[in-house]
């Protein structure tokens, strides 16, 4: 031992120190040899950070050592990129380090290509997945590999960061979850969250930190009550607060539609006992202190989740009437909950020095339900593609399997209804669905399906049959939601098309104009192109939906025919939305001067709403006035085609000048958000002209405010004031046409 310690490479000392705590008799010479080979093979390679590439496999090995993995796994981790990224062959690696290490390295290499989408030969996939299920260390290495990559992701280009973060959320984090590796899963999710939604992440962090003092006081009170009662009941246990995970908080805000203040996970405790019987006794103690909430007790000790996770969960009405989540488990169960399948690798008991897995360890792994399911799928799948699809589904969401009357299997998300089933069969079957029979009995269309049920749907033969708007309230599958939404969007477009045609006819007749001469295919196509619509039908639809007014289109048609004098000015301002309110000005002073032409009439263009500080240009209108635009106005290119009409203009604001400003506010939706933002604006003494807010499906509120202000230099202070409103993660100026 002493000799071995003295010859260990200093770079490996941290890894060796952690590994020795669990495996004091581990053979460290093979670790040393693996590091030397990896260091030599990666010698000419650098990470994106500029660090030597060897730092990556070394970091992965350290993560696995902290998880308690065996020596063989650490060796494979050190070598896991050599076959793919260097000239080192799998045959040479296997000959030097043995079949077990070779199998692990080969599995990690193939898993990279398969699960994340690259092509691979069918039978190779089947063999690799089978081996993966029989030796889950392949999966554990892959998860650790991605964890280190996510920790160092800041050195990659933003688009690659986003792609990797999405892969991590969709595949790797769920994989860690299925392996029971909770601590790794949470870190992967939070790292991905910070990359994909940085502003939302920062706002959640800020909100959690803001509640920390009151939360800590509350938890201290709860912990003291539990500890005192457990001690009085002679139950030996440790009580601790549970860590907060930002992605989990954000998901609950979205999926359950909760405000931040209503999320139970912010207040939770964990009780760690010595014996299983003490866990059940501790539940009794907790329920004697506070009223349990109905339906919130889960016994994962008797029925382990995924065959790995064991714990008792309960939610009670705690002090001050707040929901309190409590987890109760033994210390061994907690180690498994944190490290999952990795916690089973205590090879000092399960494995001999010859590197062979003992039968008792193999049986322990085989008890894991998800691993058995992988092997079952491998046996049943007709081809590797079918098998891989099953794996992808299982990683993504909880699924149920139901049958058609002919015995075909349909996979659906948990909570699906006969309508989801109908759309899974075919889009037209979904659209025409009018009833359903489950296991031979008629059921309501909103009835939730369960595993193994036989579902039959009835369809309408009416030519105008279509979905009901009510279905949107209970379908859960993405396919059904998308198809129903597309149906009604198409229906609305058709109605808007006819409405738009009628509006155009009324507007032309109101002006006493020749309808046939003015509104024809050629002239309307020209205006559609000018207004950036795909075709004439799209233009009519936009009119019917109120995106552009019929009056504006008629004015453009007149300009095409050389009609009214102000046609070109209308062209310059065609992007002004019909809903933008007019500015009630108390003065004609727009704060702009024209060098060499004092007293000339000027006005600020509505399409880009310039304010002092913006770079501007003047455009001489047909009436002799000057329209002032930002140089980055959406209409700048068309204006500059008439260079003779572009003139210099300068800002010259006076105390009486008033400017129109529009801002967009993005925030995590909550009760009274609009009221609080409006109050912040009012406190800044601006005259609010209009406000609108829309809320997306992911609980993000997008608000638009248009207001008048005298001194735009004050805008930065105003934006900061709005940004300080709770839940707001971004606020910025937009043009009125944006």
UniProtKB/Swiss-Prot annotation:
Protein keywords: ATP-binding, GTP-binding, Hydrolase, Kinase, Magnesium, Manganese, Metal-binding, Nucleotide-binding, Transferase
Domain HD residues, every copy: 53-150
Comment on bound cofactor: Binds 1 Mg(2+) ion per subunit. Binds 1 Mn(2+) ion per subunit.
Entry annotated with the keyword Manganese: yes
Residue span(s) of domain ACT: 662-736
Regulation: Transferase activity occurs when RelA binds to a complex containing uncharged tRNA, ribosomes, and mRNA (RelA activating complex or RAC). The addition of charged tRNA to this complex has the opposite effect, inhibiting transferase activity and activating hydrolysis activity.
Factors inducing expression: By MazG.
GO MF annotation terms: ATP binding; GTP binding; GTP diphosphokinase activity; guanosine-3',5'-bis(diphosphate) 3'-diphosphatase activity; kinase activity; manganese ion binding
GO BP field: guanosine tetraphosphate biosynthetic process; stringent response
Family as reported in the entry's similarity comment: Belongs to the RelA/SpoT family.
Entry protein name: Bifunctional (p)ppGpp synthase/hydrolase RelA
């Amino acid at each position: 031992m002493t000799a071995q310690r003295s010859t260990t490479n200093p770079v490996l000392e941290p890894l060796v120190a952690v590994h020795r705590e669990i495996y004091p008799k581990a053979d460290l010479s093979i670790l040393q040899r693996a590091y030397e080979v990896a260091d030599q093979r990666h010698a000419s390679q650098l990470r994106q950070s500029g660090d030597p590439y060897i730092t990556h496999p070394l970091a992965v090995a350290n993560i696995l050592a902290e998880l308690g993995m065996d020596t063989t796994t650490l060796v494979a981790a050190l070598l896991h990129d050599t076959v793919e990224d260097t000239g080192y062959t799998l045959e040479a690696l296997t000959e030097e380090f043995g079949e077990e290490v070779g199998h692990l390295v080969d599995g990690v290499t193939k898993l990279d290509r398969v699960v994340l989408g690259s092509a691979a030969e069918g039978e190779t996939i089947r063999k690799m997945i089978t081996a993966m299920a029989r030796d889950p260390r392949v999966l554990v290495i892959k998860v650790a590999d991605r964890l280190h990559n996510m920790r160092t992701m800041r050195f990659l280009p933003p688009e690659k960061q986003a792609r990797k973060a999405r892969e991590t959320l969709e595949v790797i984090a769920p994989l860690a979850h299925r392996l029971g590796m909770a601590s790794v899963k949470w870190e992967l999710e939070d790292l991905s969250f910070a990359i994909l939604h940085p502003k939302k992440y920062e706002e959640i962090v800020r909100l959690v930190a803001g509640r920390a003092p009151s939360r800590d006081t509350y938890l201290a009170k709860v912990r003291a009550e539990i500890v005192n009662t457990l001690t009085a009941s002679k139950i030996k246990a440790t009580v601790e607060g549970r860590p907060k995970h930002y992605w989990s908080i954000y998901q609950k805000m979205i999926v359950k539609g909760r405000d931040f203040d209503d999320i139970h996970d912010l207040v939770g405790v964990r009780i760690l006992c010595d014996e299983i019987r003490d866990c059940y006794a501790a539940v009794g103690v907790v329920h004697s202190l506070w009223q349990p909430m109905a339906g919130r007790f889960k016994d994962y000790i008797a029925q382990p989740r995924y065959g790995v996770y064991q714990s008792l969960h309960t939610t009670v009405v705690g002090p001050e009437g707040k929901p309190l989540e409590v987890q109760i488990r033994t210390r061994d169960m907690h180690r498994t909950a944190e490290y999952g399948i990795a916690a089973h690798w205590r090879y000092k008991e399960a494995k001999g020095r010859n590197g062979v897995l003992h039968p008792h360890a193999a049986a322990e792994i085989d008890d894991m339900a998800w691993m058995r399911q992988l092997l079952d799928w491998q046996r049943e799948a007709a081809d590797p593609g079918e098998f891989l699809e099953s794996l992808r589904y299982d990683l993504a969401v909880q699924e149920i399997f139901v049958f058609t009357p002919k015995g075909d299997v349909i996979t659906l998300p948990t909570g699906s209804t006969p309508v989801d089933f109908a759309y899974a069969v075919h889009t037209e079957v979904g659209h025409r669905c009018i009833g359903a029979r489950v296991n031979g009995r008629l059921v309501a269309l909103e009835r939730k399906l369960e595993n193994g049920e036989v579902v039959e749907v009835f369809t309408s033969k009416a030519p105008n049959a279509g979905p009901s708007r009510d279905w949107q309230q209970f379908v859960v599958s993405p396919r059904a939601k998308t198809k129903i939404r597309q149906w009604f969007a198409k229906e609305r477009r058709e109605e808007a098309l006819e409405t738009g045609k009628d509006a155009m006819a009324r507007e032309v007749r109101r002006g006493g104009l020749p309808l046939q001469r003015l509104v024809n295919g050629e002239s309307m196509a020209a205006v559609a192109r000018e207004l950036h619509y795909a075709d004439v039908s799209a233009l009519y639809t936009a009119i019917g939906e109120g995106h552009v007014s019929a009056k504006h289109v008629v004015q453009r048609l007149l300009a095409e025919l050389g009609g009214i004098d102000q046609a070109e000015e209308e062209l310059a301002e065609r992007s002004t939305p019909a809903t933008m309110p007019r500015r009630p000005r108390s003065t004609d002073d727009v704060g702009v001067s024209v060098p060499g032409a004092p007293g000339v009439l000027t006005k600020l263009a509505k399409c880009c709403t310039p304010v002092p500080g913006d770079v501007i240009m003047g455009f001489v209108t047909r009436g002799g006035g000057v329209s002032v635009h930002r140089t980055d106005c959406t209409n700048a290119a068309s204006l500059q085609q008439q260079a003779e009409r572009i003139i210099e203009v300068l800002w010259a604001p006076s105390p009486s000048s008033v400017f129109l400003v529009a801002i967009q506010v993005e925030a995590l939706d909550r009760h009274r958000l609009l009221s609080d933002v409006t109050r912040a604006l009012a406190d800044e003494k601006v005259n609010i002209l209009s406000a609108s807010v829309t809320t997306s499906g992911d609980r993000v509120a997008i608000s638009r405010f248009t207001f008048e202000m005298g001194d735009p230099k004050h805008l930065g202070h105003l934006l900061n004031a709005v940004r300080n409103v709770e839940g707001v993660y971004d606020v910025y100026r937009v043009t009125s046409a944006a």
